[in-house]
Amino acid sequence: MIKVEHTNKTFSGKYGEVHALQDVSIHVEKGDIYGIIGFSGAGKSTLLRLVNGLETPDSGTVMVHDQDLGSLKKAELRKLRRKIGMVFQQFNLLDSKTVFHNIALPLILEKAPKDVIEEKVNEVLRFVELEDKKDTYVSQLSGGQKQRVGIARALTTTPDILLCDEATSALDPQTTESILKLLKKINKEMGVTILLITHQMQVVQMICNKVAVMENGKVVESGSVLDVFGKPQALVTKRFVEVSCMGGKA
């Protein structure tokens, strides 16, 4: 479903070049909940942007649904990205608009018929259990409710891939657990493949079946969650395990 092969990405910064990705490869299969974990600056967000077609690698390939993103025309890329939902850390919602309007926005931009918009928004509102907040302004919601709105918005185009960028890092532990349960429900009941990035080992342990550990732009370890965290090889992986055992957040 998602194949990233030997990708490299370098950015030019104020203090010289930053090697954001160095020979990075990951394989995400249909039905996976695949976690990318690493500390700040590890390259996680850059990798996610490659998968979403927002960045192009300097070398290597990014395949989604057996299509090389680098070879697609703009119209083809837009069509493919319609099947990729995105959930953000800071929600990226319009506070001055209602829950309904925020969720409907992707369909409004596509100029979908009003009855189609109404039906789809109500459907995803039921799924994320926010039916009673339909006409509420986003500014009046809690952090957890805002993230549910963000998830519902991502589901309006019926994606088969969901990319989550630190989707729970701004939430308290109890709310984090409820959002992770929702993501697991989306994976199980809708058959959506999920690729998430995080710096919290507990998030990966709770819902992921596979994980890749990143450090300094490289994947230093990958495999099943049980194998990687049960028998950590890389120093950074061992550090995550140690922090988790102490009950803290990496």
Model-derived features: where do they sit?
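ABC ATPase "signature
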Residues: S222-G223
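Conserved ABC ATPase signature
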Residues: Y137-L141, Q145
